[in-house]
């Protein structure tokens, strides 16, 4: 009888897990591609992954298959052929990456938080924002900081007044392009900022699912971005009553810089 109960519970748990939506949106609502979109609407969803260069992975696997591989070799793998990450490398299995949809109908004004933490550096390391969004900056260090947002490919720049220790301020994004948010006093406090008009984004763990539901039919630009790798660009057509599946893999041999 007990085995039967456990069997029923296990089946219920598995059924419950399988019924979970493939993505949890920023507002806490789930997205399920098996559920039809609202009338007249469509959606875009998929998986976005960041990975090392395929040649790097190949060499790591080859070295990992040798019993006498050198632990100090920057390409060294493990005995099972998996890449071993050291302190100077990015573990792309855990990197936060962005799925971005450029939607002319999107309204700006979303608030993004950035915090300078002294010895801990500045978090987050990257932001995807829309023109007109707000970056809320908190100075959690022990020194005054002068923040500015600059176009890395041009001369455009915007600043906020000196921010005292413990202070915070809002900066409305007035620039479009590939930007950096940093300070005059400490250039180690830096955040890569991708800014576009009509930008909608989801920040997810590498290998996770993103979703943009309830979209009007039409053609959109879809971007996948990780600040260490660059941008992967796609065109996507949203059709009424349809969920469009678009996956993205970011690596040094697939992105546009």
Question: Residue locations for each model-derived region?
Answer:
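Positively charged n-region of N-terminal signal peptides that target proteins for export
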Residues: 1-7
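Bacterial N-terminal signal peptides
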Residues: 9-21
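Signal peptide processing junction and immediate N-terminal pro/mature segment
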Residues: 21-27
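Extracytoplasmic copper-binding redox domains, predominantly the cupredoxin/blue-copper superfamily
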Residues: 27-257
């Amino acid at each position: 009888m007990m085995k039967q109960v456990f069997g029923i519970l296990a089946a219920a748990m598995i059924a419950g897990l399988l019924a979970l939506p493939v993505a949890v949106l920023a507002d806490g609502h789930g997205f399920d591609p098996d559920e039809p979109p609202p009338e007249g609407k469509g959606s875009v969803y998929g998986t976005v992954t960041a990975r090392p260069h395929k040649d790097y992975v190949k060499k790591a696997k080859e070295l990992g298959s040798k019993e006498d591989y050198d632990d100090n070799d920057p390409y060294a793998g493990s005995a099972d052929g998996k890449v071993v990450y050291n302190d100077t490398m990015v573990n792309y299995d855990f990197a936060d990456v962005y799925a971005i949809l450029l939607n002319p109908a999107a309204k700006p004004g979303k608030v993004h938080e950035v915090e300078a933490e002294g010895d801990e550096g500045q978090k987050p390391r990257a932001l995807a924002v829309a023109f007109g969004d707000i970056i809320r900056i908190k100075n959690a260090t022990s020194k005054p900081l002068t923040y500015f947002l600059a176009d890395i490919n041009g001369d455009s720049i915007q600043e906020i007044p000196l921010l005292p220790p413990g202070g915070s301020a809002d900066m409305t994004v007035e620039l479009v392009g590939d930007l950096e948010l940093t300070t005059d006093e400490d250039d180690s406090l830096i955040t890569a900022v991708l800014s576009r008009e009509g930008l909608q984004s989801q920040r997810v763990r590498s290998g996770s699912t993103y979703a943009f539901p309830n979209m009007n039919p039409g053609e959109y630009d879809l971007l996948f971005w990780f600040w260490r790798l660059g941008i992967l660009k796609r065109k996507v057509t949203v059709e009424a009553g349809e969920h469009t599946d678009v996956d993205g893999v970011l690596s040094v041999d697939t992105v546009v810089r």
